[in-house]
């Protein structure tokens, strides 16, 4: 008996009338989002799209980058898997896909239905058929004329930028003009003159965003840490000859607190005028709270009263003349001058030797005796006290020079700097020693005793007397008070506490205060050692100092001439390669045997620690830091690890005048732009091992929906990266689609050419030659409907396979370790490589790394990131460990594919493997065919397919909203009817979107329900009727099952049981 499925279409649900409750679906116009078209882009009143029942959508003005990379949490949300019913019917198993959704809905208990709110209006579904409902967004196409309209405007923007800065960057302008000419040439010679955006390919875009490949790469600039500066007129211009010093060393008056204006300047004036009074301490705390970003949890806030009490005692350790005069050197200089005045005439650079005698000598020694009686310290240069001091200082100076790599440097002795390569014990040294003793003695008379927990009086005396300036002394008193109160720490306090506010203020006035506290007061603080890490990596969005910053970058590429890939790895390998080989043959666990990939080679490429190319070599005679490195800047290196690959360490300079430019979209938001010549597409950048020193820059720009980006700095960078290798994006589609199209085609062409070289009759090309040929390959773009299509077509072309594969089913067989090897062996070429005893086909099996790690959504534990790669050495077939991350945020080919360029010696192409090498080969195949991979359960991106589609449509021709319902049937055989609900629609898009399921056995076709009626493309009968519904005339759509039987409320559960 035929059954019927009822759909009621009404303007608004007024009450739970019987006519409504008996219908399976109710479609209303309540809450419908108004259409809005802006400059040819069809959209909505986006304010009305926030937080509607249905998809879990956040505010429309959130950036697309934040939307994709941040986890979105919605109350009452749960995941759904739109295609599971069809997959169960088709494959009798669950197929993990990319279009999962997070749904938020609400039960309407009166209607006994479930409410969702798509853009077309509120909809109510009966519970038994609701689980098979999902939402879809169509990214509409834009006219090509509008897509191409930005080309001339970009050139105009950079011309105006040059005028604004009054600096013409000839290289940049030349690049932009080259790009314009290349794009126009492609449009004229290859692309259609009229039409609409060719394709969007949301699935591939989605995957490339997940894999961090939707964009380009540019080098980190490793610039001198902001704590350091280059000493002028010292050393040479080359980075290796620089002399640098800490910015906080020397005159503190370069600080903002001496600028003459501003709150920090006003606070300094008050401290110097009023000392550390209660009111001054309160103002110091209030200032620090405005800027404090501490997020610690340390309990027990120090009170104002306790701080006043501490300071009352600690300030007595500050020499009186520092308080009175307030000048840096007053106390020491005044005392020293007075002492020198009473001395006999002497050569102060000679050793301190003097005997008692008549006249002036007699008076001098009388003064020394008087000093001893008055202060209890014998400073007679002929007595043991001075000689003991000479011995102690000499040992200290010798130790300091040894620690400085044998180079002379300066050490603070008795409050002054002394060179380590001079003989200690001169008259000057003796006077400085006596001066320091006098300062300690004079201060000690005024010191108040206090029961400190951690501080020691003798250290406080020595420390305060060695400091420069009363301001520094007072601020350090506060820091020391906190150190003592919290018994040995000055960090980890709660935000807004008195302690955290004081430390913030001290840090702003004296950024290097922690080091000085440790060195001068003998306290124990945990400090990050940065003296050997002088350089830090920065990107184009980093902040740079006004006066400019200096450092270096890594550049790399491939040279064409004079290189041969048919060579073995030789002397560049260490003994660890043999150790690993033996460990594998003995059956030891891979994770226990494998080491850092760098350990298998003698050379150091700095891929793990690129910020440490230049290290501290110690200090010069002026206490400036000198640099050392085994590499030279501006020298091109050709590593024996690779063939045509080169890299160079180049000096860089980032200045506001040259590098600061405005953003195209936010014209008042400046950023610092690096040299275009270094930019690389991700596909090409990953061919080099130094991709670890580069930054991935994505193209996720603008709001997550409702904003059209015509051009942006990120898109310029992408275009410049392509232009560097002779390629341009296509302009027969929108910029989002064209950016992914060129990237996926480059990857496909590169991988096919690289691994096809291992076929017996193929050309043995270097990467440089391959890159040239690939640029020709990608002039005509291949179309890949999904990432899996790209993945399988690449695999088939490498193994010369022309079968028509069922994409989803075959992909899942490759993913499953139970069926992976069996599926791979269906490729004749793969099976031939497995069975062959020759070296060259064996090396082609390195393609297994691509097969395994380039699957979509795969997750690899970073703790097990080192995996095997086969290489040909002078000793035969061997294996090394490679890093599949290579310091990147995601899985990257750059950690292993550079090693594939070198193949084997020409004489070994037909060489048969030994028994041990065959054992290694079998182990290698088993390793990758049984390597278990986790599907990435990435909470931040796994449920954002429709949000991404909406962003794409917003940047092209607009967005259409659909609700799709699958109605399963059970007789005469299992099948499904697709019912699609929309306000307006394009039936061709729906048919294309659902084609894979509409063409399967058991499909009953689709019925499109929209405002104007229905479009029936199914085998069932559908009628449009009128129904009088409590005072209003509504539309009722009845779908008759005919000879088919719609599933009952338990059918979905029965279908799911088949997947277990």
From Swiss-Prot:
InterPro entries from the UniProt entry: Capsid_VP2_Orbivir (IPR001742)
Claim: Transport is one of the keywords in the record: no
Family: Belongs to the orbivirus VP2 family.
Organism placement in taxonomy: Viruses, Riboviria, Orthornavirae, Duplornaviricota, Resentoviricetes
Function: The VP2 protein is one of the two proteins (with VP5) which constitute the virus particle outer capsid. It is the major target of the host immunogenic response.
One Pfam assignment: Orbi_VP2
Keyword Ubl conjugation: no
GO molecular function, one term: structural molecule activity
Name of protein: Outer capsid protein VP2
Subcellular location: Virion
Cellular component, GO, one term: viral inner capsid
Species annotation: African horse sickness virus 4
Record key words, sorted: Capsid protein, Inner capsid protein, Virion
């Amino acid at each position: 008996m035929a059954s019927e499925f009822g759909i009621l279409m009404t303007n608004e649900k007024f009450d739970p009338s019987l006519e409504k409750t008996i219908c399976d679906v109710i479609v209303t116009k309540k809450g419908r989002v108004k259409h809005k078209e802006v400059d040819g882009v069809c959209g909505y009143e986006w304010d009305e799209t926030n937080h509607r029942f249905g998809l879990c959508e956040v505010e429309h003005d959130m950036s697309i980058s934040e939307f994709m990379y941040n986890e979105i949490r919605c109350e009452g949300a749960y995941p759904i898997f739109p295609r599971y019913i069809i997959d169960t019917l088709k494959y009798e198993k669950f197929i993990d896909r990319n279009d999962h959704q997070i749904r938020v809905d609400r039960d309407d208990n009166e209607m006994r239905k479930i409410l969702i709110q798509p853009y077309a209006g509120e909809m109510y579904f009966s519970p038994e058929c609701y689980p098979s409902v999902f939402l879809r967004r169509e990214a509409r196409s834009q006219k090509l004329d509008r897509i191409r309209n930005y080309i001339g405007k970009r050139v105009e923007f950079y011309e105006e930028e040059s005028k604004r800065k009054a600096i013409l960057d000839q290289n940049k302008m030349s690049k932009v003009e080259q790009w314009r000419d290349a794009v126009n040439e492609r449009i004229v010679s290859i692309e259609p003159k009229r039409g609409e955006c060719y394709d969007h390919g949301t699935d591939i875009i989605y995957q490339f965003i997940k894999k961090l490949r939707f964009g380009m790469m540019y080098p980190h600039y490793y610039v001198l840490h902001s704590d350091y500066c280059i000493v002028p007129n010292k050393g040479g211009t080359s980075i290796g000859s620089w002399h640098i010093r800490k910015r906080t060393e020397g005159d503190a008056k370069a600080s903002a607190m001496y600028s003459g204006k501003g709150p920090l300047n006003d606070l300094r004036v008050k401290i110097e005028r009023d000392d550390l009074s209660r009111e001054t301490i309160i103002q110091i705390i209030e200032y620090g709270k405005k800027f404090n970003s501490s997020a610690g949890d340390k309990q027990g806030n120090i009170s104002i009263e306790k701080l006043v009490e501490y300071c009352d005692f600690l300030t007595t350790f500050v020499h009186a003349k520092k308080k009175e005069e307030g000048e840096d050197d007053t106390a020491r200089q005044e005392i020293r001058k007075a002492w020198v005045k009473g001395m006999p005439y002497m050569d102060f650079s000679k050793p301190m030797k003097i005997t008692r005698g008549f006249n002036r000598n007699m008076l001098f020694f009388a003064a020394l005796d008087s000093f001893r009686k008055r202060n209890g310290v014998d400073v007679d240069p002929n007595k043991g006290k001075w000689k003991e001091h000479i011995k102690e200082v000499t040992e200290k100076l010798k130790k300091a020079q040894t620690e400085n790599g044998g180079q002379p440097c300066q050490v603070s002795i008795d409050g002054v700097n002394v060179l380590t390569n001079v003989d200690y014990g001169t008259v000057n040294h003796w006077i400085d020693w006596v001066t320091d003793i006098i300062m300690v003695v004079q201060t000690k008379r005024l010191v108040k005793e206090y029961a400190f927990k951690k501080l020691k009086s003798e250290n406080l005396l020595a420390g305060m007397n060695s400091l420069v300036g009363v301001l520094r002394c007072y601020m350090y008193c506060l820091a020391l008070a906190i150190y003592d109160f919290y018994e040995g720490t000055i960090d980890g306090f709660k935000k807004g506490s008195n302690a955290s506010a004081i430390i913030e203020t001290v840090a702003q006035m004296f950024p290097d205060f922690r080091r000085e506290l440790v060195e001068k007061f003998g306290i124990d603080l945990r400090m990050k050692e940065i003296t050997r890490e002088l350089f830090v990596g920065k990107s184009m969005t980093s902040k740079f100092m006004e006066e400019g910053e200096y450092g270096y970058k890594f550049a790399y590429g491939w040279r064409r001439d004079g290189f041969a890939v048919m060579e073995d790895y030789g002397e560049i390998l260490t003994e660890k390669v043999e150790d690993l080989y033996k460990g594998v043959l003995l059956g030891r666990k891979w994770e226990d045997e494998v080491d850092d990939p760098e350990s298998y080679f003698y050379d150091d490429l700095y891929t793990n620690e690129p910020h440490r190319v230049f290290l501290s070599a110690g200090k010069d005679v002026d206490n400036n830091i000198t640099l050392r490195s085994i590499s030279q800047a501006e020298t091109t290196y050709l590593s024996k690890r690779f063939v045509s690959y080169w890299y160079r360490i180049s000096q860089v300079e980032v200045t506001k005048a040259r590098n600061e430019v405005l953003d195209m979209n936010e014209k008042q938001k400046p950023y610092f732009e690096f040299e275009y010549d270094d930019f690389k597409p991700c596909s090409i950048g990953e061919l080099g091992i130094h991709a670890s020193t580069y930054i991935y820059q994505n193209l996720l720009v603008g709001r997550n929906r409702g904003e059209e980006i015509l051009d942006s700095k990120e898109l310029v960078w992408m275009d410049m990266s392509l232009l560097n290798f002779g390629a341009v994006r296509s302009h027969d589609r929108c910029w989002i689609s064209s950016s992914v199209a060129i990237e996926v085609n480059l990857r496909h062409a590169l991988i096919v050419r690289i691994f096809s070289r291992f076929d017996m009759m193929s050309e043995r090309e270097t990467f440089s030659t391959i890159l040239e040929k690939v640029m020709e390959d990608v002039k005509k773009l291949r179309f890949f409907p999904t990432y899996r299509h790209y993945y399988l077509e690449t695999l088939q072309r490498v193994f010369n396979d022309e079968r028509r594969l069922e994409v989803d089913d075959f992909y899942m067989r490759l993913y499953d370790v139970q069926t992976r090897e069996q599926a791979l062996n269906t490729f004749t070429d793969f099976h031939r490589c497995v069975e062959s005893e020759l070296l060259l086909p064996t090396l082609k099996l390195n393609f297994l790394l691509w097969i395994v790690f380039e699957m979509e959504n795969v997750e690899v534990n970073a703790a097990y990131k080192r995996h095997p790669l086969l290489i040909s050495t002078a000793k035969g077939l061997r294996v090394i460990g490679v890093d599949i991350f290579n310091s990147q945020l995601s899985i990257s080919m750059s950690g292993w594919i550079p090693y594939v360029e070198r193949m084997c010696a020409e004489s070994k192409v037909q060489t048969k493997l030994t028994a041990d090498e065959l054992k290694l080969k079998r182990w290698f195949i088993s390793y990758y065919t049984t390597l278990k991979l986790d599907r990435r359960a990435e909470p931040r991106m796994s449920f954002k397919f429709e949000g991404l589609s909406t962003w794409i449509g917003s940047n092209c021709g607009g967005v259409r909203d659909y609700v799709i319902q699958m109605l399963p049937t059970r007789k005469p055989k299992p099948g499904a009817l697709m019912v699609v609900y929309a306000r307006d629609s394009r039936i061709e898009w729906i048919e294309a979107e659902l084609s894979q399921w509409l063409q399967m056995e058991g499909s009953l076709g689709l019925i499109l329900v929209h405002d104007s009626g229905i479009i029936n493309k199914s085998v069932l009968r559908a009628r449009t009727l009128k129904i009088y519904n409590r005072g209003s005339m509504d539309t009722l759509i009845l779908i008759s099952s005919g000879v088919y039987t719609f599933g009952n409320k338990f059918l979905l559960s029965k279908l799911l049981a088949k997947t277990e």
